[in-house]
């Protein structure tokens, strides 16, 4: 793993204030890192902090006739997230809370289970669409490609906690 440090030109108090300045900074940082470590960096995963983030819960329910398929799983999650999102917001993450089979059994993974009804409860994270577009514009102006944008606390938990830690309820305090 490589690392490098440079000034955060174009960013003030965690917000982008100049796309041009930040684009130059990103390009300089990538070039320094590639040269220092003999790397060719391609896709970038960006962790986002957003003071305008909101979290809501969603719930979806669909009828099932037999075994639950991946398509059923996708459809019930889509139904659970079918809330209207303001034009200035973007759904960044949908986090499964639980699946309920036949209004009785709570399961983590319903695929291939038999059911008449499948319900999904999810946690939906929305962020400022302008913040995301600004990040994408900075990277594009620097000829850098975005692979994914992840909310900062989720990125940290993915980097630091194992699946067992998460399953056992470990709390990461930032």
Predicted regions and their residues:
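Nucleotide/phosphate-binding catalytic cleft detector across ATP-hydrolyzing
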Residues: 1-43, 48-173
């Amino acid at each position: 793993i490589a690392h490098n440090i440079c000034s955060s030109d174009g960013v003030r108090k965690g917000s982008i204030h100049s796309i041009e300045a930040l684009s130059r900074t990103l390009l300089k940082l990538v070039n320094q890192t590639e040269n220092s470590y003999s790397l060719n960096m391609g896709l970038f995963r960006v962790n986002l902090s957003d003071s305008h983030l909101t979290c809501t819960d969603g719930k979806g329910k669909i009828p099932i006739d037999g075994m639950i398929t991946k398509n059923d799983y996708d459809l019930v999650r889509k139904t659970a997230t079918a809330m209207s999102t303001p034009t200035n917001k973007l759904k960044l993450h949908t986090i499964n809370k639980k699946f309920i089979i036949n209004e009785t059994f709570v399961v983590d993974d319903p695929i291939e289970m038999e059911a008449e009804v499948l319900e999904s409860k999810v946690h939906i994270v929305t962020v400022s669409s302008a913040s995301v577009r600004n990040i994408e514009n900075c990277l594009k102006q620097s000829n850098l490609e975005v692979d994914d944008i992840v909310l900062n606390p989720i990125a940290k938990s993915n980097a630091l906690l194992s699946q067992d830690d998460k399953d056992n309820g470990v709390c990461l305090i930032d």
